[in-house]
C-alpha cells in the first residue's frame, strides 16, 4: 500500500518540526534583542494578511511572549480590502481559535486600485500606500506602540538588489524604522528568518492561507527576476545568501562613495579611518570561492557574465 502522508497535527509533533519551530523563534528573538524592537509595556499590532509570513510572525511572537522577560500586548490586525471572493470569516475564526486579541478593518481599497490602475499594470505601489495609511490609523486607534510586519530575510535581500539594479541605490528594508510623521515604530521581527523555513513551518502548522487575488498572480517582473537569481545562488553556491545577509549588518561607509555617509571632502593625511589601508589588500575569501554568475531571468542559454 502507498505510504500515507502525516497529518498537519502529526507533523507538528515531529522532532524535525519542533527544531524548525525553535529555530524560527530563536531568530525572531535575536532580531528583537539586536534592534530593541519590543520593550516592557509595548502594544504590538501584528499585521496579518492571511499569508504564510504573517501567520508565522504572529505564531512566533505569541510563543515568545510566554517566556519573554518583558510584558507586552499583542493585537492581530487584518485589513479586509473587499477583494472579490475574500473569505472574511477565516481570520476571525482563526484568531478566536488561538485566543489572540484582534481587530478586523474593512476598507474597499480594492475598488480604488482597480479604478486608478490600468488593466495589466502592477497595482502594488498604490495598494501599498493605501494600506499603509489605514494601518497607521488603526495603530493609533488601538494605542499600538509597535507595528509588526512579516517581511523576512529574503524580502530584505530582494529589495537590496532591486534598488541596486534598478534604482541606483544601496538600500534594503530596515528591521526597524520610524514613520515619516514620527508617530509609529515599524518592526520586522522575521529579519533573520528565511522564506524556506517559513514555508515549511506554515505547511506544518496548516495555517488557513488566503491568496491575494489582487496582486498574487502579477508578481512584479523585476522582483521575480531578483528572486530567481537569489534562488539560483542559494542552490548552486551554498553559503552565499547567508554571507549577503550578514553584509547588511557589516557596512563600511569609508569604503563606499557616498559623501553623505563619510566626509571624503574633509579627508586629509591627518585623518584616521578604521580599515583605511585595507583597500589595497585582497579580500579574505574562502579558498574555493565560486565565481558570481549573472544571467538574464529569461535566458535559457549559456550567455553569462562573471
UniProtKB/Swiss-Prot annotation:
Cofactor(s) essential for the protein: Mg(2+); [4Fe-4S] cluster
EC code(s) of this entry: 2.8.1.-
CC cofactor note: Binds 1 [4Fe-4S] cluster per subunit. The cluster is chelated by three Cys residues, the fourth Fe has a free coordination site that may bind a sulfur atom transferred from the persulfide of IscS.
GO molecular function list: 4 iron, 4 sulfur cluster binding; ATP binding; magnesium ion binding; sulfurtransferase activity; tRNA binding
GO cellular component, one term: cytoplasm
Protein location: Cytoplasm
Protein name: tRNA-cytidine(32) 2-sulfurtransferase
Amino acid at each position: 500500500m502507498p505510504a500515507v502522508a502525516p497529518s498537519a497535527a502529526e507533523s507538528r509533533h515531529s522532532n524535525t518540526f519542533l527544531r524548525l519551530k525553535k529555530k524560527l523563534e530563536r531568530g525572531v528573538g535575536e532580531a528583537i534583542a539586536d534592534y530593541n524592537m519590543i520593550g516592557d509595556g509595548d502594544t504590538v499590532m501584528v499585521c496579518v494578511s492571511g499569508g504564510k509570513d504573517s501567520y508565522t510572525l504572529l505564531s512566533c511572537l505569541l510563543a515568545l511572549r510566554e517566556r519573554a522577560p518583558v510584558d507586552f500586548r499583542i493585537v492581530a490586525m487584518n485589513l479586509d480590502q473587499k477583494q472579490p471572493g475574500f473569505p472574511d470569516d477565516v481570520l476571525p475564526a482563526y484568531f478566536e481559535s488561538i485566543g489572540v486579541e484582534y481587530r478586523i478593518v474593512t476598507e474597499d481599497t480594492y475598488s480604488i486600485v482597480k479604478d486608478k490602475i490600468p488593466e495589466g499594470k502592477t497595482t502594488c505601489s498604490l495598494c501599498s500606500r493605501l494600506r499603509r495609511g489605514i494601518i497607521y490609523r488603526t495603530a493609533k486607534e488601538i494605542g499600538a506602540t509597535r507595528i509588526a510586519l512579516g517581511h523576512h530575510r529574503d524580502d530584505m535581500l530582494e529589495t537590496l538588489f532591486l534598488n541596486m539594479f534598478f534604482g541606483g541605490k544601496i538600500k534594503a528594508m530596515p528591521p526597524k524604522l520610524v514613520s515619516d510623521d514620527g508617530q509609529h515604530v515599524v518592526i520586522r521581527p522575521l529579519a533573520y528568518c528565511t522564506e524556506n523555513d517559513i514555508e515549511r513551518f506554515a505547511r506544518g502548522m496548516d495555517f488557513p492561507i488566503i491568496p491575494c487575488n489582487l496582486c498574487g498572480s502579477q508578481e512584479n517582473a523585476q522582483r521575480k527576476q531578483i528572486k530567481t537569481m537569489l534562488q539560483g545562488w542559494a542552490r548552486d553556491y551554498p553559503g552565499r545568501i547567508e554571507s549577503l545577509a550578514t553584509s547588511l549588518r557589516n557596512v563600511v561607509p569609508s569604503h563606499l562613495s557616498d559623501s553623505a555617509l563619510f566626509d571624503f571632502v574633509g579627508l586629509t593625511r591627518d585623518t584616521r579611518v578604521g580599515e583605511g589601508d585595507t583597500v589595497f589588500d585582497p579580500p579574505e575569501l574562502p579558498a574555493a570561492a565560486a565565481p558570481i554568475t549573472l544571467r538574464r531571468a529569461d535566458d535559457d542559454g549559456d550567455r553569462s557574465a562573471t
